[in-house]
Amino acid sequence: MKVTVVGAGNVGATCADVLAYREIVNEVILLDIKEGVAEGKALDIWQKAPITQYDTKTTGVTNDYSKTANSDVVVITSGLPRKPGMTRDDLISTNAGIVRAVTESVVKYSPNAIIIVVSNPLDVMTYCAHITSKLPRNKVIGMAGVLDTARYRAFLADEIGCSPKEIQGMLLGGHGDTMVPLPRYTTVGGIPVTELVEADKLNAIIERTKNGGGELVKLMGTSAWYAPGAAAAQMVEAIVKDQKKIIPVCIKLEGEYGIDDCYLGVPAVIGKNGIEKVIELKLNAEEKALMETSRKHVKEVMNVLDGLPQQA
């Protein structure tokens, strides 16, 4: 299996490293527009192989998409990261142009690839890649829910004092302030989280999760990369190993949850065909209202993208 990671910044390089270290695929191509960056990071990852014992070959290239030909999966991480004071939506104009150009090059050389979008604003960049690629919706997937849910689980693990592996949870909706928490679907070792965490503390964790990316931007001066890179690699693994794993991903909704033509995070079965099935959870009135708020926000930003010049 061959996977291409476009963008050799922090997130892209981390994704490539995880794919190699865990031997998820046979070959990783790391591509970047900046001369030498992808080559250097890929070489560094490959030189780690004798130490940490893996065989996945990593190769870096500078803006030569012919070297990515016949990739099974392509992860798009290209774009500007957030700076303190910025929202994800502030990145739309610049990153839309980048994602559009990258997607066109990707499908030219790997027309059958499944595309995973990591660039922000995530939901709208998934829309951008989807309409540019003209691929079926099951083959263009946004990485958001995996990361948001991981942050939620990590915060809960700290509060409860348990392993994060014991926590199962799900977050829906947009990637950002309008994400939809589902505490009643959250369990800790099979125990409902509401039995272990008081309501006010649980609400505080939910709010912290919503601002999880912003918290890291304030601390580091730029966007996170370890968890996002690992989250993208987990999605790649589910696809190339045909795991039929149920994880929250951003996808174009076509009637699910009563929503049409909008890109939102929902749980789905992920396998060799990308999105194999969308899981529709039964939402209560409050959750439906939050989902509608999320839909409205994402749709507004989609409309902004529609109004941008195509060469933006």
From Swiss-Prot:
Pfam families: Ldh_1_C, Ldh_1_N. It is an enzyme of class 1 (oxidoreductase). Keywords: NAD, Oxidoreductase, Tricarboxylic acid cycle. It catalyses: (S)-malate + NAD(+) = oxaloacetate + NADH + H(+). NAD(+) binds at G7, A8, G9, N10, V11, G12, D32, N95, V118, S119, N120. GO terms for biological process: lactate metabolic process; tricarboxylic acid cycle. The active site is at H175. Substrate binds at R82, R88, N120, R151. GO terms for molecular function: L-lactate dehydrogenase activity; L-malate dehydrogenase (NAD+) activity. Its EC number is 1.1.1.37. Catalyzes the reversible oxidation of malate to oxaloacetate. Belongs to the LDH/MDH superfamily. MDH type 3 family. This is Malate dehydrogenase. It comes from Cytophaga hutchinsonii (strain ATCC 33406 / DSM 1761 / CIP 103989 / NBRC 15051 / NCIMB 9469 / D465).
